[in-house]
UniProtKB/Swiss-Prot annotation:
UniProt pathway annotation: Pyrimidine metabolism; CTP biosynthesis via de novo pathway; CTP from UDP: step 2/2
Gene label: pyrG
Alphabetized GO MF terms: ATP binding; CTP synthase activity; glutaminase activity; identical protein binding; metal ion binding
Keyword tRNA-binding assigned: no
Enzyme Commission designation: 6.3.4.2
Additional information: CTPSs have evolved a hybrid strategy for distinguishing between UTP and CTP. The overlapping regions of the product feedback inhibitory and substrate sites recognize a common feature in both compounds, the triphosphate moiety. To differentiate isosteric substrate and product pyrimidine rings, an additional pocket far from the expected kinase/ligase catalytic site, specifically recognizes the cytosine and ribose portions of the product inhibitor.
Residues reported in the UniProt entry to bind ATP: G13, L14, G15, K16, G17, I18, D70
Taxon lineage: Archaea, Methanobacteriati, Methanobacteriota, Stenosarchaea group, Methanomicrobia
Domain named Glutamine amidotransferase type-1: residues: 289-530
Described function: Catalyzes the ATP-dependent amination of UTP to CTP with either L-glutamine or ammonia as the source of nitrogen. Regulates intracellular CTP levels through interactions with the four ribonucleotide triphosphates.
Record text on subunit structure and interactions: Homotetramer.
Presence of keyword Ligase: yes
GO BP terms in the entry: 'de novo' CTP biosynthetic process; pyrimidine nucleobase biosynthetic process
Name listed for the protein in its UniProt record: CTP synthase
Length: 534
């Protein structure tokens, strides 16, 4: 097994995840099987209970793991499926070490950071890498070098470097070159960051430097000299128009070749699919406008996978999707604002929790339905579409979800039966992959091209089966089901009106878009042409 370990310095949020994903993409295009592990040095067991404002979206894996959004980038770039074990947290490590101590596994020894915690970290990394069957395992250590939280993980990989043959492990350090008022890129923060890393016993083979513009030659020379790496291994990771360009940018600088040389890997395979996909992305000539009506609109990372899935649909349909975030509560406070949605070619209601903004979202759903604007509702978005339909079409006055109104006379959305009595929040929802059978001839069957699908879920509430027949008699169709669970709702005869209880965005890939998103964008493109009289 070959390991590539990525650390970060100067500040957090530099893009270590995109760096790892891009390196992995390029190695995959050389014919290697690649996997990735994200280490998050927080005490939370997973990301499931974190606020989107604090940590961005929670990405859901096939096995139900609720993880950091970086794993979503890994899956999209590497076109792979990971598991909850690919996300290590301090909480997971300490929980296991303490459990072993309580069982007596340490045979009366004093349990310490070294060796017990570091051994657990190394063991988990190696087990995950081995189980994946990969040739190369990329590891991102979250946070910044110098953070007290990441010390045990840095010590663990230092020990791995000592235990593994030198040709089996490579270290990459991501830093930042800031520009002064004269436009000169300053290298001192990078120098100090590498110095701090070396004080921990780690020396990077490669330094990836984030910057606004391409790294100046003088800056590259300074970093190479003072950080003691060859100049060709100082890589410019300057801002790109789109993150999907990053693999191509670092490939042009020879990083893949240099890593393969260090790891003693050889390959004559050249897969140009990624380059072709990026070329298609840039060759789009038409633009359509999408409104995402939500409650976490101030932080785009809250809806990262949705934005990426929309982009994938745009690439496949040959158009650029201009996305605007609309705060649902603004529609509630000023109902006249709803008329502004007429300018959009599509409306999307994402998932979420809690009652804040739900009435505003339903106003947007009603507007989309009545004006026949292509619509996609995801998870809570589908549930709200069902409530809106029940209220305004089926005339069930007061219809609601028991999440928002336990005394609703028409609880068309209700708690999953198995959720009754569940007290803990973390890891207790209906999570991960579940199948659905699609109705033949439905919109769902048409866009998926099959009657059997598997998609990822994250919810506690569902369409109440007691109301299904009554609602369907008014024209809505529940075209995807898991036994007696409603997975998809659609309204035939519309340009595109589709809701999914699952989260299709988590399985969307560049070059292989999620069918609901592809269907939405296709309908938007067609609608735009109709509006322009083409």
């Amino acid at each position: 097994m070959k390991y590539i370990i990525v650390t970060g310095g100067v500040m957090s949020g530099l893009g270590k995840g995109i760096t790892i994903a891009s390196i992995g993409r390029n190695l995959k295009d050389k014919g290697y099987k690649v996997t990735a592990i994200k280490i998050d040095p927080y005490i939370n067991i997973d990301a499931g209970t974190m606020s989107p404002y604090q940590h961005g979206e929670v990405f859901v894996l096939k096995d139900g793991g609720e993880v950091d959004l970086d794993l979503g980038n890994y899956e999209r770039f590497l076109d792979t499926e990971l598991t909850r074990d690919h996300n290590l947290t301090t909480g997971k490590i300490y929980l296991e070490v303490i459990s072993k101590e309580r069982r007596g596994d340490y045979l009366g020894k004093t349990v310490q950071i070294i060796p017990h915690v570091t051994n657990e970290i190394k063991s988990r990394i190696r087990k995950v890498a081995a189980r994946s069957g990969a040739d190369i395992c990329l590891i991102e250590i979250g946070g910044t070098v110098g953070d007290i939280e990441s010390m045990p993980f840095l010590e663990a990989v230092r020990q791995m470097h000592r235990e593994e043959p030198s040709e089996n492990i490579a270290f990459i350090h991501v830093t930042l070159a800031m520009e002064d008022l004269q436009g000169e890129q300053k290298t001192k923060p990078s120098q100090h960051s590498v110095k701090e890393l070396r004080a921990l016993g780690l020396s990077p083979e490669v330094i990836v430097v984030r910057s606004k513009s391409p790294l100046q030659e003088s800056a590259k020379e300074k970093i190479a000299l003072f950080c003691d790496v060859p100049q060709e291994l100082v890589i410019s990771a300057h801002d790109a128009d789109d993150i999907y360009e990053v693999p191509l940018e670092i490939e042009e600088q020879g990083l893949t070749t240099q890593l393969m040389k260090h790891l003693q890997l050889e390959s004559s395979v050249e897969n140009g699919a990624w380059k072709k996909m990026v070329s298609r992305m840039h060759s789009t000539t038409n633009t359509v406008k999408l409104a995402i009506v939500g409650k976490y609109t101030n932080l785009e990372d809250s809806y990262l996978s949705i934005l990426e899935a929309v982009k994938h649909g745009g690439i496949d349909n040959g158009c650029r999707v201009e996305v605007n975030m609309v705060e649902a509560e603004i529609l509630e406070e000023n109902p006249a604002e709803i008329e502004k949605l007429i300018q959009y070619d599509g409306i999307l209601i994402p998932g979420g929790f809690g009652g804040r903004g739900t009435e505003g979202k339903m106003m947007a759903i009603k507007f989309a339905r009545e004006n026949d604007i292509p619509f996609l509702g995801i998870c809570l978005g589908m549930q709200l579409a069902v409530i809106e339909f029940a209220r305004n079409v089926a005339k069930l006055k007061g219809a609601n979800s028991t999440e928002f109104d336990e005394d609703s006379p028409y609880p068309v959305i209700d708690l999953l039966p198995e959720q009754t009595g569940v007290a803990e929040m973390g890891g207790t929802m209906r999570l991960g992959d579940y199948e659905a059978i699609l109705t033949e001839g439905s919109i769902a069957a048409k866009i998926y091209g099959t009657n059997y699908i598997v998609e990822r879920h994250r919810h506690r509430y569902e369409v109440n089966p007691e109301f299904v027949d009554r609602l369907e008699s008014y024209g809505i169709v529940f075209s995807g089901k898991n036994k007696n669970r409603m997975e998809i709702a659609e309204i035939p005869g519309k340009r595109f009106f589709f809701g999914s209880q699952f989260h299709p965005e988590f399985r969307s890939r560049p070059g292989r878009p999620s069918p609901p998103f592809n269907g939405l964008v296709a309908a938007m493109c067609k609608y735009r042409k109709e509006r322009e009289g083409r």
